[in-house]
Amino acid sequence: TLADGTKVWLNKNTILQYPRNFEGGKRHVYLNGEGFFDVKRNTAKPFIVQSHAMQVRVLGTTFNLKSGENGQRAVATLLKGEVEVKGNHGEGMIVLSPGQQAELDGMTRRLTVKPAEPGIEGWHDTAFDLNQTDIRTLCKILERAYNVKIIIAPDVDIERTYSGPLKKKENVAATLDLIKNSIGIKYKVIGENVFISSSKSK
């Protein structure tokens, strides 16, 4: 929690630079990595998150920003409120609505808007409330939550769905153990890769 009451969750290997107290007419922080922000509303003092590639300006909202030092790709995703996103090198400015994300390609210098990726906030949540969530979407949520890559075999019935609360466990294997029978899968974890196949396959 920052001095103004803003709450920030940082993904691993992320650095957030911020002052002990926010002085002047702005609340300015610098992010390298991925952070989830629940910004305390203050219309007189905008909250600005600066990264290597883009800047996000807000008054009070909930959003996720992912941007590395190399600046090749930066993604800002809005969950609640309104944010203003602009590139650091004249790529333009975009105002996002909830459920949208702005993506900046550092190679082409293009700033585009698209629907938010499912489970974008999952990496910092302690539980997921799932409702008729198909396997492909569920895998995206788990990838975000555990920072892994999930490979789905062709024999998996991706139309199958899962509903209900799912508490985040210490690792992805522990979570998959809870749901594998419900969605008819088996899995194998090799490093940071997870291979999912049908439970009926040999």
Predicted segments — roles?
Residues 1-202:
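A residue-level detector for the "anchor" residue at the start of short, highly conserved motifs
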